[in-house]
Amino acid sequence: MNITVNPKGVTVNQFLMKTALPLGGYFIIEYLIRNYTASNIFLGLLNLPMMAVTAVLLFLSIRKLRDLLLDGQISGFVAWTFGVQLMFFAGLIEAAFIYLFNEFLVPTNLVTVHNQLVAQYESALTTIEGMASASNMAASMIPMVKEMIELLKDTPVATAIETAISMLSNDIFYGMLIMAFVAPIVRKKK
């Protein structure tokens, strides 16, 4: 779709590509924060606000697209489509970074994150075992947590390309979900 209605002659696709660059940069920062807070459960709670910021950025981007290039009107489906495209392009930028980061910059990163996850479950198991004498529920959780630890230990560490593709597919999926809520809101200028 090459709709050109602004004086500079910018097409919708050009707008989406230019908007995807800063969004991809935000995704890279989000990945680094998530990556380096993986060992702390409380810092892991940052994921929800970061996802909310993604929704706000998508809303602002699609609203700007609507106002600058589409005469202030956009259908819900077109808004949803552009939002998913924006998440795809931004996700491609993030995926390229994730691949380069995990393959060349910090090749031990994925192993470290995997080992931190195993250590978190082992720490949780120790805590649950300490509570087992006081609670039947805690005692019933011990076999499940032990099984999860064994599964994690047996699971091979993801490669850099697997991680990049996984994050790209996550970005597209989250884009679909977020835009299902954002598209009806951004449809027309009030």
Located regions from the model:
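Transmembrane alpha-helical insertion/packing segments
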Residues: M1-L70
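Alpha-helical transmembrane segments of multi-pass membrane proteins
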Residues: Q14, K18, P22, T81-I93, ...
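Hydrophobic alpha-helical transmembrane segments in multi-pass membrane proteins
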Residues: P22-F27, L86-I98, D171, G175
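Structural signal for membrane-spanning alpha-helices in multi-pass inner-membrane proteins
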Residues: E30, R34, L58-I62, E94, ...
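Alpha-helical transmembrane segments with an aromatic anchor "belt"
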Residues: L68-F88
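Functional transmembrane-helix hotspots
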Residues: F97-S135
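Individual transmembrane alpha-helix segments
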Residues: P143-F173
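Juxtamembrane interface at the cytosolic side of transmembrane helices
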Residues: G175-K190
